[in-house]
Amino acid sequence: NSVHPCCDPVKCEPREGEHCISGPCCRNCKFLNAGTICKRAMLDGLHDYCTGVTSDCPRNRYNH
């Protein structure tokens, strides 16, 4: 079994100095910059963007 390079296998959390393990707003163990598109617009015409502080891709706050 290979260990994920971002993951501390004992604690099951990001290694010291790293931000994240995986997710649409995580790349190379770091959060993507705020404003990076993490989900392209579909029917509503609004993209979803990374916040720079989480690996999740939050829904565009202007979506109804």
Curated annotation (Swiss-Prot):
Disulfide bonds join C6-C29, C20-C26, C25-C50, C38-C57. It is found in: Secreted. It comes from the Eukaryota. Residues 1-64 form the Disintegrin domain. A motif (Cell attachment site) lies at residues 42-44. PROSITE patterns: DISINTEGRIN_1, DISINTEGRIN_2. Its main location: secreted. Expressed by the venom gland. GO terms for molecular function: toxin activity. Pfam families: Disintegrin (PF00200). Keywords: Cell adhesion impairing toxin, Disulfide bond, Secreted, Toxin. GO terms for cellular component: extracellular region. Belongs to the disintegrin family. Dimeric disintegrin subfamily. Heterodimer; disulfide-linked. Inhibits adhesion of cells expressing alpha-4/beta-1 (ITGA4/ITGB1) and alpha-4/beta-7 (ITGA4/ITGB7) integrins to the natural ligands vascular cell adhesion molecule 1 (VCAM-1) and mucosal addressin cell adhesion molecule 1 (MADCAM-1). This is Disintegrin. It comes from Echis carinatus (Saw-scaled viper).
